[in-house]
Amino acid sequence: MPINTDRILTTHVGSLPRSERLIRANAARRDGSIDEADFQKILTEETQAVVDRQVEIGIDIVNDGEYGHAMSQAVDYGAWWHYSFARTGGLKLLTEGNPANEVHRSEPGKLKYTSFADRRDWTRFQDFYTAELDLGNDPDRSFPVAVAPLTYQGQDEVGRDVRNLAAATDGKGAHSAFVAALSPGSAARVGNLYYPTDKEHIYAWADVLKEEYKAITDAGFTLQIDDPSVAEGWDQINPEPSVSDYLDFIQVAVDALNYALEDIPTEQTRFHLCWGSWHGPHSTDLEFKHLADTLLSIDAAGYTFEAANARHAHEWKVWENLELPEGKYVIPGVVSHSTNLIEHPELVAQRIEQFAQVVGKENVVASTDCGLGGRLHPDLAWAKLESLATGARIASERLFG
C-alpha cells in the first residue's frame, strides 16, 4: 500500500529543540536537585507541547522530539547515541585506557575504526575542527566501555517515552507517530574490553536493542533506526579504504541490525542513513551511490537520508538507476540541519518533485536531512519545519491536483 494517497506526507528525522524548561530539568536531574516526580511531570508536559507544535505547523508523522533522550544544554550533537548508555548494563566509565580513543591504521581487507579525532576529514581540516566547530561543551560527558555482558535496562525509560507520546498524540489529528532508537552498529562504537571480537560485540548490542525496538512497535508506533555508522564510518577508516572493503566491513553491522529486526514488523520500521550531523566540511563523505544497495537490504519499509545539503543534494539522481522494492518508500531530506538559511518553500517543493519523478509520488515522504535539535537555534529549526510543510503542500497541489 502506498504511503501517500492524496498528498505528500511530512515528517522529520527525530531530534527537535529541547525547551529551556526541559533543559533546566535535565540538568537538575543529573545533579540531583529535582524530585523525580517533578521531573517526570515536566517531561510529560513538554512532550505534549512539542507534539502540539508539530501538528500545528503541519507535520504529519510526528514524534516526541526525542525529549526522552536527555539534553542538559542547547547544543548537543550526541543525544541520539548517549541516551543508550544509561539504558544498558555491562558498561563502565574509564578514566584512561578507553580503546575507542586508540589510533588505528587499516590495511586492505583488515579495516578497523580509528579514533574520532583521527578521522580523515578532521585531520585534513584540523584548524577548523579545533577552533571553529562547536559540538557542545559538556564536561561530564564521557564514553563508556563494555566490560561485562551487555544487558538492556531501559524498560522504564522506553515505557515512559511511548506512554508520553501516546498521550500527546491522542486525538490531535497527526497521521501517525514514530520513536527513534539506536542501531547495533552505532551503539558498538563505544569501546570494548569484554567481547573477543567486534562481531560478538555488535551482536550483543543487537540483543540489547531489540528489546527497545519491540517496546516501541508493540505500543503501535513506527520504529526509526538511527544508524550514522553505515555512511559516516567511512571517514573513520584511515587511510581511505576501497569501497568494496568498506562495504564488507559494515555488512556485519547491517546483518546484526536485520537480526535485531527479525521480530519487528517491517511496515512499522524506517531506517535513517546520514553522514554525521556536525557542521563540518564533510569532504570525505562516501557517495550515496555506493551505499544505496546496502540501504535497500535493510529490513525496513521507509528509508530516510540526507538529500538537501550541499554535499548530497545532487544525489537524488542516483534513484533513477535504482528499483525501489514494492511496499517501500523514501523519506528524503528536503530541508537541512547544516545551514542557518531557511529553505524557500518553492525549493522544498522542487526537491520533493524530483524524488516523485524517480520513485513515484505515492512513495515520497518529505523530511529533514537529520535531527534539528541541538544543531540549530530553536527558532530556525521550527522555521525550517514550517517551510517543509508549506513546500509539501505546494508539491501536493502540483502532483495530486
PLM segments and residue spans:
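Domain-level signal for soluble alpha/beta catalytic cores
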Residues: 1-401
